[in-house]
């Protein structure tokens, strides 16, 4: 389903998000929280 596809995309994006999180804060921090919930 759509939810599964979104989760798969987020899982792939998480390593990238974590790299960005070291440079940026705010939105990326929120995304990181989402990533930690997925794993």
From Swiss-Prot:
One of its GO terms (cellular component) is other organism cell membrane. It comes from the Eukaryota. Disulfide bonds join 14-35. Keywords: Disulfide bond, Membrane, Secreted, Target cell membrane, Target membrane, Toxin. Pfam families: Ectatomin. The keyword Disulfide bond applies. SUPFAM superfamilies: Ectatomin subunits. Expressed by the venom gland. The keyword Ribosomal protein does not apply. GO terms for molecular function: monoatomic ion channel activity; toxin activity. It is found in: Secreted; Target cell membrane. InterPro entries: Ectatomin, Ectatomin_sf. Heterodimer of subunits A and B; disulfide-linked. Belongs to the ectatomin family. Ectatomin-Et subfamily. This is U1-ectatotoxin-Et1b subunit A.
